Design a protein with these regions (language model features):
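Short, Lys/Arg-enriched N-terminal segments with co-localized hydrophobic residues
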Residues: 1-11
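Alpha-helical coupling/stalk and coiled-coil linker elements that connect catalytic or binding modules
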Residues: 9-439, 446-476, 498-499
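ATPase nucleotide-binding head domains, primarily ABC-like/P-loop NTPase cores
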Residues: 80-81, 262, 383, 389-608
Length: 608
């Protein structure tokens, strides 16, 4: 036990030091970049002041002298602006990386508030998400989630809500997570790249337009001719006017004609533009994220498959998407002064719209494959980071036959290491139920959630908080905190009955379930509750089910005598020593001997 604790401590200290070193180094680097940016700003101000002074001093000189002075000061000013932009981008990246590692350090101390817990995903209708606190503040999802795309978040949440039941798929996912666990710099670069320009839930709908919108300009031969003809005529007009072969009035007339032609198809261009105008930045970000993936050589089958999905006839998906972002960016300038002028002289808007439609025709069908792969990788990065942050966790073995869940020293991932009491579990066949009895606050509910959360992690391919674990991936169903529903006019008791009926129906349909129940039939009197609980347990055993039931009703413990090969009793005791109540939170065999309600009432001065 001591050697195990020392191993965990040494592993966690290494992770703490890793993140702390990055925070220190990158905070210092960000400070240095801020100083450089401030210096560049000061130099630019000096250049402006110098230009004004020199123009004032040489104001009586020839215009060529003034033009030379302007060029002399403007060129370094522009160069400094470019340098400033690059330094500012580096500063933002550096600060974001330092901030990520600060948040990871907080996460190691169980403060996950910087990360999205997806509270909107929590649902009482779901088989287990509400009972196990999967979503929301200080939830399992919040502790794991490091996704930077809306699609990736949806993918990861989907894995939590629909864990795998296929052994081969779980092992394939384990292999991918193991590999990504070691790609720490890649995961961090991926996260920071995405978080600098975060998307939102509308991105997926916008991106779907890439393959759904029909072309309206690219098949029009007249416009394809005009985008070549108008610029050519302008070149001839310019040469003619320069050589005095044409009067300036001709240029004026052609300017008016070009203006009319340029905006003759404004409605069609608006149709193309409006479907894409908000996508420039998000596509630029997606291009950079995909580039992160393309630059690696993965060994695991799952990650190699994701990598291969970005291949596209000798080109990289990132460069193709970046080109689209550039086309959209160019069209986004159509209402600027330069954009209007270029449109009149070159039909730039029409040219860009045709390029966009051509891109969609050539690559529109590829986008679904690319962005699905990006979402997968985003979700895997979260699980890889989770594995990296918990070096003491293990990957469970996956059993072939229903049902088995056998583990040593299971702990809840959200309980602090210094207070987390770990317990074992042993279910080796079907049907089999563990009946857990015990006093209030003795640890029954925490144990149920510990088992449920680790079972879920194992079924999504992630490492689990245990010394060892073997499990069979069945569908998990829980009933731990059924509540009243005013909206549907449902009582607590009826809501619980519906839950239990759903479990029985699924079992009778042949579905393999892992069932976790806490204090069933709480909404009725003790005699009725006992009778109903006994009947339910017998029905669950008859349907070859497996699971765990926690209860205060000691009579349920008598079922072990009737079903010695299907039911096993365990207990959490409340020990009274020197007139004080203590809890060991250790699982023991047998039926609970001590209850604490009357003792606590007496301690609080309530007559019993």
């Amino acid at each position: 036990m001591v050697s195990s604790f020392l191993f965990i401590f040494a592993g966690m200290e290494k992770i703490y030091n890793y993140y702390q070193d990055i925070v220190t180094a990158y905070t210092r680097r960000a400070d240095n970049l801020k100083k450089k940016i401030h210096l560049l700003g000061s130099i630019r101000l000096l250049l402006v002041a110098g230009l004004i002074t020199m123009v004032w001093f040489f104001k009586s000189e020839d215009w060529k002298v003034l033009a030379g002075i302007a060029v002399l000061f403007t060129i370094p000013f522009i160069a400094l602006m470019v340098w400033h932009t690059k330094l500012f981008a580096r500063k933002c990246y550096t600060e974001a990386l330092a901030n990520l590692c600060k948040n990871e350090l907080n996460g190691l101390d169980y403060d996950f508030s910087a990360f999205d817990g997806a509270p909107e995903k929590s649902s009482a209708e779901h088989s287990f998400s509400l009972d196990l606190d999967l979503f929301g503040n200080h939830s399992l999802f919040q502790s794991v989630n490091r996704t930077v795309t809306f699609m990736g978040k949806e993918k990861l949440a989907g894995w939590f809500m629909q864990p795998l039941t296929d052994k081969a798929m779980i092992l394939r996912r384990q292999e991918a997570i193991r590999e990504l666990e070691s790609f720490t710099q890649l995961r961090q670069h991926f996260y920071v790249t995405g978080i600098l320009h975060p998307g939102n839930k509308d991105d997926q709908q916008l991106i779907s337009l890439l393959s759904k919108t029909a072309p309206c300009l690219i098949n029009n031969k007249i416009w394809k001719l005009l985008i070549c003809l108008i610029p050519s005529i302008w070149v001839l007009v310019a040469i003619g006017c320069a050589l005095n072969l044409l009067p300036v009035s001709i240029a004026g007339m052609f300017f008016g004609l070009s203006f009319i032609i340029a905006y003759l198809n404004a409605k069609q261009i608006a149709t193309v533009h409006n479907s894409l105008d908000r996508m420039e930045q998000i596509l630029q970000t997606y291009s950079e994220l995909i580039k992160c993936i393309e630059g690696e050589n993965f060994q695991s089958a799952e990650l190699a498959d994701i990598h291969n999905r970005f291949a596209s006839d000798g080109q990289t998906a990132s460069s193709i998407i970046k080109k689209l972002s550039g086309h959209i960016g160019a069209l986004n300038q159509r209402f600027s002064a330069i954009g209007v002028i270029l449109n009149i002289f070159t039909l730039r808007d029409t040219r860009m719209a045709i390029k966009l439609e051509k891109w969609k025709m050539e690559h529109g069908e590829d986008t679904e494959r690319w962005f699905e792969a990006l979402a997968l990788f985003d979700a895997y990065c979260s699980l890889g980071g989770f594995a990296f942050n918990h070096p003491e966790y293990i990957y469970p073995e996956i059993a072939d036959v229903y049902f088995k869940m056998e583990g040593k020293a299971l702990g809840h991932p959200l309980l602090r290491r210094d207070i987390c009491v770990k317990n074992d579990i042993e279910i080796r066949k079907s049907p089999w139920f563990l009946i857990i009895t015990g006093a209030n606050m003795a640890g029954k509910s925490t144990y149920l959630r510990t088992i449920g959360v680790n079972y879920l992690l194992g079924c999504i391919g992630a490492p689990v908080c245990a010394a060892s674990l073997t499990l069979y991936p069945a569908r998990m169903v829980t009933s731990l905190r059924t509540s009243d529903s005013l909206a549907s006019n449902e009582s607590y008791f009826f809501a619980e009955l519906k839950r239990l009926k759903m479990i029985i129906d699924r079992l009778q349909q042949g579905e393999q379930l892992f069932i976790i129940l806490d204090e069933i039939l709480k909404g009725t009197n003790s005699i009725d509750k006992q009778k109903g609980s006994l009947a339910l347990m017998k029905q669950l055993v008859a349907n070859q089910a497996c699971g765990i039931i926690a209860t205060h009703d000691l009579a349920l413990g008598e079922l072990e005598k009737e079903f010695p090969n299907q039911i096993k009793n365990y207990r959490f005791e409340a020990d009274i020593q020197d007139n004080e109540l203590t809890f060991s939170y250790q699982l023991r065999e047998g039926i609970a001997q001590n209850m604490n309600a009357c003792f606590l009432m007496k301690k609080m001065g309530i007559t019993v």
